[in-house]
Amino acid sequence: MEISHQPVMVDEVIQYLITIPEGIYVDGTVGTGGHSLEICKRISPKGELICLDIDRSSILLAKERLSVFGDRIKIIKESYVAIDKVLKKIGIDKVNGILLDLGMSSYQLESSGRGFSFIKDEPLDMRMDEDRGAAASELVNTLSMERLQELLWVYAQERWAKLIARAIVEERRKGPINSSRQLALLIETTIPVKYRHRKRHPATKTFQALRIAVNKELENVADFLEKCPSFLENSLFFLSQALPL
């Protein structure tokens, strides 16, 4: 499969990440392998890269893309939050650098079929890890209006949070909201008319908030940051790069 996703600012990221060419590095969100490919090109034959991700389909693509590097690279289906357990299991105490590329890849947006995009008509899932947790449709169809409003405001600062939450609750009384397009159309017809045709799609912030909630993105980053000092070599870098919506 041809992979269209290109990592953002890859040269700048790799320049600061790789401080010791023969070191041990972690790509905590390998995705389809864009950053990992460049890391492997720039570390020495004695260097090692550990790749983590929870998206099963992305991992399969990364394994194919990075297979040329052989045993210099380990690809493991696990969250970066569990990096301490992963390192312990493979017998590594310290690493020289860690990369997190937070957010969605274009592959997930365009090809995953999990409802990340409000343009496509797909199941309203939004789980990065299809093997765990509640799908976005479960949140949309079961949370109270107050909780939905809070979620939209806290995770996306959606100015129309109350209107959208009320519309969701009213709509689901008629039947479940199970597709991304169904939800997007509901939001489009809910917000005031003069705000419906601006540059940013009216559903952008709602979809962002749901994705963050479904995947516990903020909680995961907070947990990870608490663990960093225990396995990062002194004075070396932890890089976190968030992709724009």
Where do the protein language model's features map onto the residues?
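S-adenosyl-L-methionine-dependent methyltransferase catalytic core, i.e., the SAM/SAH-binding region
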Residues: 1-245
